[in-house]
Every structure is written in C-alpha cells, then in structure tokens.
UniProtKB/Swiss-Prot annotation:
Protein function: Catalyzes the formation of the alpha-1,6-glucosidic linkages in glycogen by scission of a 1,4-alpha-linked oligosaccharide from growing alpha-1,4-glucan chains and the subsequent attachment of the oligosaccharide to the alpha-1,6 position.
Gene Ontology MF, one: 1,4-alpha-glucan branching enzyme activity
Residue numbers annotated as active site: D414, E467
Protein name per Swiss-Prot or TrEMBL: 1,4-alpha-glucan branching enzyme GlgB
Protein source organism: Myxococcus xanthus (strain DK1622)
One Pfam match: CBM_48
E.C. number: 2.4.1.18
Catalytic activity: Transfers a segment of a (1->4)-alpha-D-glucan chain to a primary hydroxy group in a similar glucan chain
Top-level EC class: transferase
C-alpha cells in the first residue's frame, strides 16, 4: 500500500500549477497512486461540479478544493484505470472530456537528444501541434521550446484562451514543454502562454512550428494536418533527383509576388488565391518560356508591406492566399506543367512583433541578447543566434520542411551579406569582433555551410541560391573546397553596372563602355545568376522600362536590347514580374500588374521577345551549358566604345556549337560593320531585337549572312553586317 500524499505538499504544488509555475503539472494533476487506490485531480476554476466517469461504469463526484481544484479518491484501482471527466459549467452546461493529465509524453528521449544537439532533421514532425491518436485517443500533441520559462500553457478556442487550464510539462533539461490535449482537432486556433522565469507578465506567443495561421493581422496559430494532400508530381521529383549537375542546365527564372501578380478586380480588387493562381500563372509561364518561378517569401509574415521578408511563421505559408494544401496544389500544378518552383527564404533576421520569436520565453532565445549582434539596424529586426544548436536546427529543419512538405525545387537565401559580416550596416563601436578580431561571422559561416551540405545530401537536384552583394570569395564553391556551398550567387555587380549603362543616354555610353565589359573579368569566379529583381523596381527607382532613356520607342528598344544582352551573357537569368512586358510604373505590392499593356503592340513586342529569348536559350546549349566556364565565352569586340558596339561568342562544351552576339547600343544604324566569326560559311539569324514583331524598325540582314575568309577580331572569318539601332543580333552556324 502506498502512503497517501502529504496534503501540504500537494497544496503547494497545486498552487504552483495555478500560478503557471509548475514544470511538471502531471505530477499533481491527473491520476496518482494513493494508499490502496488512486486519487484523481483536475484544475477547472470555471467549473460548477466535476464527476469521474469510470470506463467500467458509475459516476464519482469530485470534491471541490479551494482555488478551482477538484479531487476524487477511488479505492481498489491503479494507474491503468481509465476514466472520463464530466464537467458542469454555469448554466447547467455539461461536457464530457478526457483528462489531458492522464497521458504519457508524446516525445521520446531520442527526439529530445537530437533536438538539443541541433541534429533533428525532421524537427517539425515533433515540435508544434500534431493531430494524432495517443493511447487510442484522438487529439493534438503540443510541444514548444522555452528553456528559461517558469511555466508554459497552451491556450485556444478549446479552453476559452484561459492560460490556467492546460499547463504543459517540461521534458527534462531539453527546455521543451509538452502536452497532449484530447479532442482538439483540425482548425483549432491556439497560442502558447509563457510565464517568464525572470518575472514579469505572461506573454502570448504564436507557435514557431505552426503549419497554419490565421489571416493577418490576426496572429493565432491553427492546428492543421499536413498528411492529407495527395501529390501528383512524382515524375517531376524523379527527374529532378537525376539532374545532378545543375550548372549545365538552362535556368530562366520569373520572380513573382503572389499578392500583386494579378488581382481579382471584380471582387474588390482582392489578391488571387493559391488555387486561382496555379492555372493562370502556369499558362503564362508556359507562354513566356521561363524554366522556373521564384516566389517572394510565402512563409507567414505579419506586415504585408515587408513583401514577406519579415517572417513571423517559418513553417506556415501565408494564409492571405489560402490554406497550406492550397499552396501545395499550386506547386504540384506547376510541376505537372513542367515548371520549377523556387522560394525566397529569410534565415538572417526576423521581426520584433510581440507574438513572434523575439524574447520568446522572456529571454533572447532565438536572437542574440547583445544588440550589437542581435539587432539589424537597417530593417529594425532581430538577428538569429546561429551559434545556438537549437536555433541552427530550427532553421535547417525549416529549409528541409519546405523541400519535403511543399516539394520546392530551391531556396533563394535572402540578405546573405548581412549574415556574413558582424559589422554589416554598423558603425564603429556598434558591433563585436570575432575571436580573431575580425568582422567575419564565424557562426553564420558554419550555419550556411551546414545548410548547403544538408540540403544537397538529402535532396540532390534541389538548389540553394545566395543573394550576396559583396566580394566574399567562394560563395558557390563546395564546402570541401573552402566555399560556402551555394549552387548560385546573385551577380549584384553585373546588375548595378548593366542598369547603370543602359539607363544612360546613348551619347554618353562610350564613356562608360567598361560597365558592360568589366563583369567578364570575374564572370567565372562564381556560379552566377543575373538578377533583375524586385529590388530594382521599388523605392523610387522606377521600372526597368522607366529607367531606359529616350522617347517611348527608344525606351522599348533599349529594354529589348537589355534583355537580349542579358540572355546572351554568361550566368543564369532572373526577371521580376512586369519587366517582361515593359511595365512603365514602379511595382506596387497592393496593385495588380498593368496587364492591359500586353495588348499594346509595343509592350506586346517586348513580351514576345522575352518568350523567344527563353525558347532559344533553352534550345541552344551554347547559351547555357558552359555559363561558369571561361571556355564558354570569348570576346570579339570588347573595345569598340566609340561605336557603342560589343561582340562576343558563346560556346557550348560540345565543340563547334556556338552563338555570335553583336550589340549596337547606339541609336545610329551601322552599315557594313565588320565582325569576326569562328567559321566560314552560312550563319542564320537566331534573333534580331529590332525585328518588326518585337516593335522594331525591321532593319537587319535578311535572316542570314555568309562569312568570308577574311580574318577579323582574331577569327578566321568575318562578315559585314547591318547593325540596327539600339539592337542585339544573335547568329549561329546554319
């Protein structure tokens, strides 16, 4: 016979439960041995009466103790005794429920060990909220990391948001709190109420691992079952896994903000949903010929004006456009239409919103405590503590989550430079040097290398792309060679120089000729992607079309030339939506693109050009399969500054396959202009941006040329050409 529990001790422990200060409420609530029977305790301060309903039948009244605790002693039973609680509330409202404190933990020792080590690669399957059958009972298991909290409870629709009712238990020294709540189902809203261990008021936090959220500005997490969706993209995933060397593939990326690509004007100008976007966007991408789309961040974010770059819910797609399975449908549809999907991902910083990750358990948990490392001055955000195992695990598991649960084909990592440098956007005295006295963030470097190695090990064919704006070496080199391990790096230098050149009046371009040639000095130092991204059409910069000089005809001609120059240049391609048809207005995230312009002949001509560029680019290995290799590019005329003319050859790895590109970026027609060619014979015109179907003046070379055995530009053959104004020509042997 067990000795009955000491009443004073029980009272003291119950008081700690009431105050949300008990790390193990299961030790006093629920069912416990007591003498030759058991004692059952429940904390329901809002109840009028509670009865125990034994599984074998009967009804036992519980005694109401002070403070809202109910207790019943039942002789001749042990802890295997199964029961329900019948709870009566004011107004004779009666509910029968399972006691949440009668269940064993849902987390195992190995889960806790690997989470603490920072090596739990499927962390989202254990943390957060999970619908499951536990000991034969349907409900939801909740788990949250809050190591310094004095107490944690889960609150929501199921308990009237009363933080006293569902206190969680701390799982040893892991800092993880857990509770299984029976009968909580799909669609239930919830948060965690945390009592800081250092004192102060309780805080309400959204679940860092929530799979679904309310529609902002509401901030609650929502219980969601991720196991219901049936995918139809197995063929795409199989083909992707077999594509081991992504650098030899054509990559032409269309960057999209889902909330403003196209809006439903007849329904209050609302954004399209994920399911509405899927067929419309896929049809458009197939027409324009892009290989991939890249979505501005789709993870939940409290402020729409951040475009998704200040993430509040890393494991939940934004509810603005639908539910998680709706986004899965969107990606599934893209894959079935042969379109890859990349997603912008923000592991460098997060917002200060009170419901989010900042000061999560009353301390700097996900961020650094010292603002010299933990605050991002440019954006007013907080910086992740990459040196903490649990934080690093949270982020790397999140990357794997989007790949495995949403089948995305790649991550574009935002603001990598802000992660790599401790003094990024900080003045002297506002940052802390590393252990060697330098400004390199060793913890972030380790994190990025671990991220890239993990993604590539587990998911061959998936790419990780760095938005990195400095001269940091070996960003796209393998970790084994001392690199960071990314597949591609955005070429920000190329973007700045190219836009600067094309925005100048042609009369001045001869003095800035090197802005287009300089990039070839470092074009093969990394695996580059050439970005004309959303960042270049906001904050008063205007649109790509608007930055081009001249009258409307010249603006369109310049933009066509820019695109053809870009598609011929070494490096993969990325264009933000609206640029492909020359939208004059700067991008506004609250407005649809100006789709009516695609019916204007001039703007439709730009769109048709981009479609043809993508088609030729995909079909011609010379334009993509040696992007990162010096043998894939050769200058013919890098120094014709006085004429604003450039000429070069793009070569494939297979000998003999090549494309000659000639750009005349002046408004003057160049007649009888001689250019060297690798072969003597017939060359066909692959592209002429001045063609009539693109809105040009239709000058050119009648679709073909015949080179003669006159050496020129270091080549054995040459031809005299007509170079249309503000144009780019492509030729290939035919």
């Amino acid at each position: 016979m067990r000795k009955p529990a000491d009443k004073a001790q029980v009272d003291a422990e119950l008081q700690r439960v009431v105050e949300l200060r008990h790390p193990e409420p299961h030790a006093v609530l629920g069912i416990h041995p007591d003498g030759d029977g058991v004692v059952i305790r429940a904390f329901r301060p809002d109840a009028v009466a509670i009865h125990v309903l034994p599984e074998s039948g009967g009804r036992v009244a519980m005694t109401h103790r002070p403070g809202g605790v109910y207790e019943a002693r039942i002789n001749g039973k042990d802890q295997t005794f199964n029961y329900l609680l019948e709870v009566e509330y004011p107004g004779k409202r009666v509910f029968t429920l399972r006691d949440p404190y009668s269940f064993l933990p849902t987390l195992g020792e190995m889960d806790l060990y690997y989470a603490g080590e920072g090596r739990h690669e499927r962390l989202w399957e254990r943390m957060g909220a999970h619908l499951l059958h536990h000991h034969g009972v349907r409900g939801t298991s909740f788990a949250v990391w809050a190591p310094t909290a004095a107490g944690v409870s889960v609150v929501g629709d199921f308990n009237g948001w009363d933080g006293r009712l569902h206190s969680m238990r701390r799982m040893g020294s892991s800092g993880i709190w857990e509770l299984f709540v029976p009968e909580v189902g799909e669609g239930t809203r919830y948060k965690f109420e945390i009592r800081p261990g250092q004192g102060g008021p309780n805080v309400l936090k959204a679940d860092p691992f929530a799979f679904r959220t309310e529609v902002p500005p509401a901030t609650a997490s929502v219980v969601h079952d991720l196991a219901r969706y049936t995918w139809g993209d197995a063929a795409w995933l199989e083909q992707r896994a077999q594509r081991r060397d992504v650098h030899h593939q054509p990559w032409s990326v269309y960057e999209v903000h889902l909330g403003s690509w196209r809006r439903v004007v007849e329904d209050g100008d609302r954004p399209m949903t994920y399911r509405e976007l899927a067929p419309a966007l896929a049809e458009y991408i197939k027409f324009t010929g892009f290989t991939h789309i890249e979505l501005l961040p789709v993870a939940e974010h409290p402020y729409g004006g951040s475009w998704g770059y200040q993430v509040g819910g890393y494991y939940a797609p934004t509810a603005r456009f639908g539910h998680p399975d709706d986004l899965r449908f969107f990606i599934d549809h893209m894959h079935q239409e042969g379109i890859g999907v990349l997603v912008d991902w923000v592991p460098g910083h997060f917002p200060r919103d009170l419901h989010a990750l900042g000061q999560f358990d009353g301390t700097a948990l996900y961020e650094h405590a010292d603002p010299r490392k933990g605050a991002q001055p440019d954006w007013g955000t907080l910086v992740f503590n990459f040196g903490r195992n649990e934080v690093r695990n949270f982020l790397i598991a999140n990357a794997l989550f989007w790949i495995e649960e949403y089948h995305i084909d790649g991550l574009r990592v935002d603001a990598v430079a802000s992660m790599l440098y401790l003094d990024y956007s900080r003045k002297q005295g506002e940052w802390i040097p590393n252990r060697w006295g330098g400004r390199e963030n060793e913890e972030a470097i380790h994190f990025l290398r671990e991220l890239n190695e993990t993604v590539h090990r587990k998911h061959p064919g998936v790419v990780v792309i760095a938005e990195e704006s400095t001269a940091w070496p070996k960003v796209s080199a393998p970790v084994s060679e001392g690199g960071l391990g990314f597949d591609y790096k955005w070429n920000m230098g190329w973007m700045h120089d190219t836009l600067s050149y094309f925005s100048k009046d042609p009369i001045y371009r001869q003095y800035h000729h090197n802005q287009l040639t300089f990039g070839l000095l470092y074009a093969f130092s990394e695996q580059f992607m050439l970005p004309l991204s959303h960042d270049e059409v906001v904050h008063g910069k205007g649109s790509l079309y608007g930055r081009m000089p001249g009258d409307p005809w010249q603006k369109r001609a310049n933009l066509r030339a820019l695109f053809a120059w870009m598609w011929a240049h070494p490096g993969k391609k990325l264009v933000f939506m609206g640029g492909e048809f020359g939208q004059p207005a700067e991008w506004n995230h609250d407005k649809s693109l100006d789709w009516h312009l695609t019916h204007d002949p001039g703007h439709h001509g730009i769109l048709q050009l981009v479609s043809d560029l993508n088609r030729i680019y995909r079909d011609m290995p010379a334009l993509h399969d040696a992007d990162g290799e010096p043998m894939g590019f050769q200058w013919l005329q890098p120094d014709s500054a006085a004429y604003n003319v450039f000429a070069f050859v793009r070569r494939a790895r297979q000998p003999g396959r090549h494309v000659v590109c000639i750009a005349n970026l002046s408004p003057t027609v160049r007649e009888n202009y001689r250019v060297g060619f690798p072969f003597q014979g017939r060359y066909v015109e692959l592209l002429n941006t001045d063609a009539e179907q693109y809105g040009g003046s239709n000058l050119g070379n009648m679709g073909q040329i015949h080179t003669e055995p006159t050496g020129w530009d270091g080549q054995p053959a040459s031809a005299t050409l007509t170079l249309p104004p503000l144009s780019v020509l492509w030729f290939t042997p035919g």
